[in-house]
Structures are given as structure tokens and as C-alpha cells.
Amino acid sequence: RKRVPVYLDKETSKRLIPRFDYCFKDGERSGYPAILEENRIELFNEFIVSGSGGEISFLPFLQKHGNIDSIGFKFNNIAYSSDVVGFHNKSLKYLYNLDYWIIDALRHLPHPTHTHLDQTLKWIKKYKTKKAYLTNMHIDLDYNYLLENLPNNVLPSYDSLNFKIEV
């Protein structure tokens, strides 16, 4: 069987693989074959993912996630920023004038590791995002309330949401 490719920077690999080595290495511990194939990526350097639909180039950028970092991704003029409470200065230039931004908005009140709705809306406006989809929303962000009260260029996401983009 073919392993599922996963893309990890050095820091993520250092933390993840020792905990889940049985997923990456044919195992003495588990007796099962490995299911994941590590592909090492470097922050702020593009990498290409190939699939049945062709190739897509991704650029990983650094985000703040409380006292640790997380990685956001930009591809074409789209960014994905989950598990984020702030951005490192080096990452900011990748956020301007996006066509789409899929971005964290956990709840109404501030949280130590996830951005809250007001902050997310400020970023969307500041960076002049054309269309944003909120993700990682907690139960206190009511979907219908958000539909009625968000700016026209911002929508709450939902499970199985999909939309077409030109690549």
C-alpha cells in the first residue's frame, strides 16, 4: 500500500514523529505497516504537492498559537490560517490582498491560542481580503447569527463546505 504523504517542518517533525513513530515506520511496536510518508518542508519556501488534479505550489508561513507556533499556508492567492492567535512579522507580507482567506475565529471572547471574532474581522479588513471563510468556530458562534451580521465578504464555514477556485 502507498503511504499518505504528510508535510512537516523540522520543528513539527521533531515533536510529532517520536510520539507517533508507528505511523511513519514499519513497526516493531505495532506490528502494522507505516501509513504516513514524511515530506520535509521549510518555512517561507514554496513546495509542490502533486495529485490527480495536477500540481499546487504551497508557501508555509509562521503563525503564533499561544506559546507555540503553527503553520499557515498560502497557495495561489489563498491563505489557510487555523490555530492562530497572531502572526510573526515575516509572515505579514503574505496576507495582503488575498482572494480567499480561510481563517480561525474561535469565539466572541479572546482566547490564549486562537483568534476571536473581532480580531479576525480586523485582520480581514486590514489585509484587504476579498472573501474570507471563518473556521474552527466554537459553539457560541451561532451560524445563523453570523450569516446575518458578518460583512458581505465574510462567511462562516461548515462541515463539507467546498468552493471552486481557478488554479
Model-assigned labels for residue ranges:
Residues 3, 35, 76, 97-99, ...:
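Short, well-ordered alpha-helix to beta-strand connector turns
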Residues 1-29:
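Active-site HxH/HxHxD metal-binding segment of metal-dependent hydrolases
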Residues 2-5, 77, 129-131:
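Short active-site oxyanion
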